[in-house]
From Swiss-Prot:
Residues 44-76 are annotated as: C3H. Zn(2+) 1 binds at residues 44, 47, 66, 76. It catalyses: ATP + H2O = ADP + phosphate + H(+). Belongs to the DNA2/NAM7 helicase family. Its EC number is 3.6.4.12, 3.6.4.13. The gene is upf1. It comes from the Eukaryota. It is an enzyme of class 3 (hydrolase). Residues 58-86 are annotated as: CC/SHH/C. GO terms for cellular component: cytoplasm; cytosol. This is ATP-dependent helicase upf1.
């Protein structure tokens, strides 16, 4: 409550008071007034609760917040810290613990998301210690502390009540009510004006609404009018994010490579906490800010990112002159934001809208969603479509290849382990063979994918067939080794023997690390000519979707285009290769696995996270599905097949072929290597405050990995998958600190996100679900596509670690836990004495609002008329498995994206279980 008077008026009233006759009395009352005034302003910035025992001060912005749990499930102080990315707090001076700054007793860190407590020797005293490294037994051993009692000071996204008392019910009734949307809006206002308050929420909001992706468009101009603003919004967001990530006081060590270029090695604390993302080939700027020498800065490309072996980042500098290798401290690191990918998307949209020759008429209308008669090609195909040096095609693969070669637009759906890459390579082989017969109109086949890894994998397979393949990589990646480096354009130029002068200049530059201005100009001309010859002679050109906008490629026209992993590419990404003259297009992917990554939540809400592959399916373009899987033990494929693919997957491997009999592991059923291992550890917020970890599951991971290693399983055969970066980082550290085997063995075990494992496989997979709160949602774990990817990476065995009681409250996981229970895979106990876990399961009830919105969307959506094998009518869906849930989730997501505005995003995500995704990693649908 405020005093209701302005400060000047308060002082005037004191001075004019007849009762204040002594100077001491005046000073005393003046001080009391100032204290009262200050006290009245120290209230929760969200709801105005001001009980000193219930509020904390954010030391970053100096605002106060209470410990009451809001509608979002988190207390107001935690909601603020997470949204604002702040981490330090202090108690109120009038609280029972005084104005204490919460920090680690041992190292002084003030990151509250790292802090926990243990009882000290005195029973009435507790000690605050950070989770790592200070709560490790080796550090606290000498202090006689029982570290097994360490608990985080934040539980269920609320400070523990003995530390910060939650407001009473009476205080909460008097508090100003505030919704999650209003809190989000207030945080946005504070970024622009730190003095904004609740009254500012009533002011008119700037219209920053974005158009939503549509199913159909009148013409290409309308298409551009919708997608162009979304690309720009995503670019602006990415730019702000990258440019705000300057890191000071970086310590550097130096190394010089054979090419005489210097590499700077350093740690990035923000990277460790999950605040920023980094990829090979990213450009960064390194600046020296010390006093030992003159100011210096240089840019370079990232050649190494943190992994299980080392947390260091490697930055290879572009130039090697005047590098301060004698200095190691006082450096800063900045991201160098590049607009290249966004510019190329915008260019593709512009060309699509203004140049009618960029696509065939048929493809133009199909991409816009127009109803036009089907079109068929009449290629001369052999009876056996298998190709040289690749496995013989099975029936579904052969049918898919034959069908797509006779159509100008085709979709191939490749569920996990079904030989999608072999099928794609076979399609490309026949497309290239047909093109080579047309000598006058010969053009290479353009093969693209959204990621470099996917491009490399497909390029390697195509090369095996005997075709001439050229892999075009970005200039920033030319020095990065890959399995297909010998196919890269720049490597082929180095070995281009038809121009001795070119070879002489390349050798001279390699030896001297530079050329004269005249020789440099001459070399550029010779390289361009050689590139032209190599590209013209190629049967197949491989690059990323964004790479197709490279000037070396974009000046050519490509009649045939194949895009692999098309469901992971945004629609504008796909348009970059398509507008290079496409007349025949093949999109390959699986829309039941992970979709495109979109950083900006508002852009994701506008459906830019929907791939072109998905939109075409909704429009009625049925994909050709590959149905024989060659990866998983049959017991591992059963649930994914029934849940995500209507039971259509067939096993191309037998049980005996997928039993690792030499591995001594306590499977509850030796011939069925699938296990849901019940773990009931507490979930905790990670150091970033935006991700989660579970120490119990991390400990179990280490025990399982150690058991495998003792059974002579190679560490490279084991993969640990988790949806949360906080858990990934903690597992890596935990195995290093607590594993009983050699540390190098644990370093070689890959621990990564679900996203990082898509398209890959391991012999054994451990899935750590992390989420275990009775009061919160289960977040990313509830995404059907993530579960599908996680369960389908292993060949010989899967172990799922999680809390079945919590997970089974959600429809998708209810069916998986039920499946495991009925099959006898649900277990509990120690690893050397596992037993079946008896659990009573009750089918979860969907919220009525979910059902109501779903019914509305069913009446509106064209999905039910799509005619796709992947989208059956709702009435015919199986009851036992969660296919219905998967389709409902997707339909509901589409409906909410189209019908909601940006402020509805939190409620939308919470209804589908991802209530904290607004704080976590980028949106990936």
């Amino acid at each position: 409550m405020s005093l209701g008077l302005q400060p000047n008026n308060d002082i005037s009233s004191l001075v004019s008071s007849k009762n204040m006759t002594s100077e001491n009395g005046l000073e005393h009352q003046f001080e009391e007034l100032l204290v009262e005034k200050q006290y009245s302003e120290e209230h929760c910035a969200y709801c105005h609760i001001k009980n000193p025992n219930s509020i904390l001060k954010c030391l970053h912005c100096n605002k106060w917040f209470c410990n009451v749990r809001g509608k979002s499930g988190a207390s107001h102080i935690i909601s603020h810290l997470v949204r604002a990315r702040h981490k330090q707090v202090a108690l109120h001076s009038h609280s029972s613990l005084s104005d204490t700054v919460l920090e680690c007793y041992n190292c002084g860190t003030r990151n509250v998301f790292l802090l926990g407590f243990i009882p000290a020797k005195a029973k009435t005293v507790v000690v605050l210690l950070c989770r790592q490294p200070c709560a490790r037994a080796s550090i606290a051993k000498d202090m006689n502390w029982d570290l097994t009692q360490w608990q985080p000071i934040i539980s269920d996204r609320q400070f523990l009540p003995w530390l910060i008392t939650p407001p009473s019910e009476e205080e909460q009734k008097l508090a100003i009510p505030i919704t999650s949307q209003q809190m989000v809006r207030l945080e946005e206002l504070w970024r622009k004006d730190p003095n904004a308050n609740l009254e500012d929420l009533d002011k008119p909001i700037e219209d920053d609404s974005l158009p939503s992706v549509e199913l159909r468009y009148k013409d290409a101009h309308a298409y551009q009018a919708v997608l162009s603003p979304l690309i720009q919004a995503e670019a602006d967001y990415d730019k702000r994010l990258k440019e705000s990530q300057t890191q000071k006081d970086v310590v550097v060590r130096w190394d010089q490579a054979i090419n005489k270029r210097y590499t700077a090695w350093f740690l990035l604390p923000k990277l460790e906490s999950g605040e920023i993302r980094l990829a090979i080939g990213d450009e960064m700027k390194l600046t020296y800010e010390g006093e030992l020498r003159a100011p210096w800065s240089s840019t370079g490309y990232v050649i190494k990112i943190p992994n299980n072996v080392s947390d260091e980042v490697g930055l290879e500098l572009k130039r090697s002159d005047k590098v301060p290798i004698e200095c190691t401290h006082n450096f800063s690191v900045d991201y160098v934001w590049k607009s290249t990918s966004f510019d190329r998307m915008q260019t593709a949209l512009r060309l699509f809208a203004t140049d009618g020759s960029r696509l065939s008429s048929f493809l133009y209308h199909k991409l816009l969603g127009h109803d036009i008669p089907p079109s068929f090609l009449k290629p001369k195909l052999p009876s056996d479509l298998s190709v040289p040096n690749l496995p013989k095609l099975n029936a579904s693969q052969s049918e898919a290849v034959r069908a797509v070669l006779s159509k100008p637009l085709s979709l191939i759906q490749g569920p996990p382990g079904t030989g999608k890459t072999v099928t794609s390579a076979s399609v490309v082989y026949h497309l290239a063979t047909m093109q080579s017969r047309k000598r006058k109109s010969h053009s290479p086949v353009l093969v693209c994918a959204p990621s470099n890894v996917a491009v490399d994998q497909l390029a390697e397979k195509i090369h095996r067939t005997g075709l001439r393949v050229v892999r075009v990589a970005a200039k920033s990646r030319e020095d990065i080794e890959s399995s297909v480096s010998f196919l890269s354009l720049h490597e082929q130029i180095k070995n281009y023997k038809f121009n001795p002068e070119l070879q002489r200049l390349l050798k001279l530059r390699s030896e001297n690390n530079e050329l004269s201005i005249q020789d440099e100009k001459k070399l550029r001309i010779l390289v361009a000519a050689a590139e032209k010859e190599l590209l013209r002679a190629a049967h197949v050109i491989c690059c990323t979707c964004v790479g197709a906008g490279d000037r070396r490629i974009s000046k050519y026209k490509f009649r045939s285009v194949l895009i692999d992993e098309a469901t992971q590419a945004s629609e504008p990404e796909c348009m970059i290769p398509l507008v290079l003259g496409a007349k025949q297009v093949v999109l390959v992917g699986d829309h039941q696995q992970l979709g495109p990554v979109v950083m900006n939540k508002k852009v994701a809400l506008a459906s830019l996270s929907q791939s072109l592959f998905e939109r075409l399916i909704i429009l009625g373009n049925s994909p050709f599905r590959l149905v024989v899987q060659y990866r998983m033990h049959p017991c591992l494929s059963e649930f994914p097949s029934n849940t995500f693919y209507e039971g259509t997957l067939q096993n191309g491997v037998t049980t005996s072929e997928r039993i690792a009999r030499h591995v001594d592991f306590p499977w509850i059923q030796p011939d069925s290597p699938l296990m849901f291992y019940a773990n009931f550890g507490q979930e905790e917020l990670s150091a970033s405050g935006t991700s989660f970890l579970n120490r119990t599951e991390a400990s179990t991971c280490e025990k399982i990995v150690t058991t495998f290693l003792r059974s002579n399983v190679l560490p490279e055969q084991i993969g640990i998958v988790t949806p949360y970066d906080g858990q990934r980082s903690y597992i890596v550290q935990y195995m290093q600190n607590n594993g009983s085997m050699q540390k190098d063995l644990y370093k070689a075990v890959e621990v990564a996100s679900v996203d990082a494992f898509q398209g890959r496989e391991k012999d054994f997979i451990i899935l750590s679900c992390v989420r275990s709160s009775e009061h919160q949602g289960i977040g990313f774990v509830n995404d059907p596509r993530r579960l599908n990817v996680a369960l389908t990476r292993a060949k010989y065995g899967v172990i799922v670690l999680g809390n079945p009681k919590v997970l089974a409250k959600h429809a998708l996981w209810y069916h998986f836990v039920l499946h495991c229970k009925e099959k006898g895979y649900l277990v509990e106990g120690t690893l050397n004495s596992l037993q079946k876990f008896s659990l009573t399961l009750t089918p979860p009830q969907k919220p009525q609002k979910f059902k109501r919105d779903l019914n509305v969307q069913r009446s509106l959506s064209p999905i039910q008329n799509a005619g796709s094998a992947m989208l059956p009518s709702f009435s015919n869906l199986p009851n036992l498995y969660s296919s219905s849930y998967l389709e409902e989730w997707n339909v509901f997501a589409q409906y909410k994206r189209r019908e909601s505005n940006a402020t509805d995003f939190e409620d939308f995500r919470s209804q589908v279980g991802d209530d904290e995704s607004k704080f976590d990693e980028p949106t990936r649908f």
